[in-house]
Amino acid sequence: MALIIRIDVDRPYGKSPVGRHLLSRLSSDLWFPRINSFGYLKELQVILEMLNKRNARSYLFFRRCTLPSERIMQLIDDGQHQIGVHLENSRSFETFFQEKQLIERHTGKTVLALSKHGSGTARYGYHHYAPYEPDRYIDWARRSRMKVFFGNLEDPSIRPNSGVNGFMAFPSAFWLEPDWRDTSLFPVDWLLSEARKSDVVLLLHPENVLEKPELAEEFARLVAELPTKILS
């Protein structure tokens, strides 16, 4: 049994300082070029380097504004990570499929994993459709011959659902950031114990983890002590 690492790549330029936060908003709502010298996906690069040193694999979920640069793609290939769609415009199957095709064209890879940007409480950007409707996403993923859906619930004890042709749906995750986790019920030690008995999804956002040294230390500990897994 193992840790299934899910990384949601939400912000192209992070959220601090203020200038990079503004570039992230501009990229999300309108357009801004991918400029490495401005720190494009800088936090993701750090996380991937940490993972690759440990031979730990992960799922990386990209938005239309966080498409991987050449440098990030090299780290992805080196670590054999999997690319997924972090769905924004979930109004219809057609809008979902457009985002899937966008990421596949950009990366040159078949995308087999799906997650949803936001949990239904707020709208995050011009292209974002806020309602959270996991049953629809699971149906779309199956129709598109994808392999796995990762949901946004916050109770990591909820078990995954398996379907036809090996499709898997994980309704919930262990959110590394404590704002989305009941830390009294699910401390990091719970995850260390549980992931030795069953597969558990660990969800994180690079800019949030690296912003707080204690989260970065917890992440490093988890990757060092637990095996990681990509679903075949």
PLM region descriptions:
Residues 1-168, 183-202, 209-232:
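Catalytic alpha-helical scaffold of carbohydrate-active enzymes acting on polysaccharides/glycoconjugates
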Residues 175-181:
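Eukaryotic low-complexity, charged/proline-rich intrinsically disordered regions
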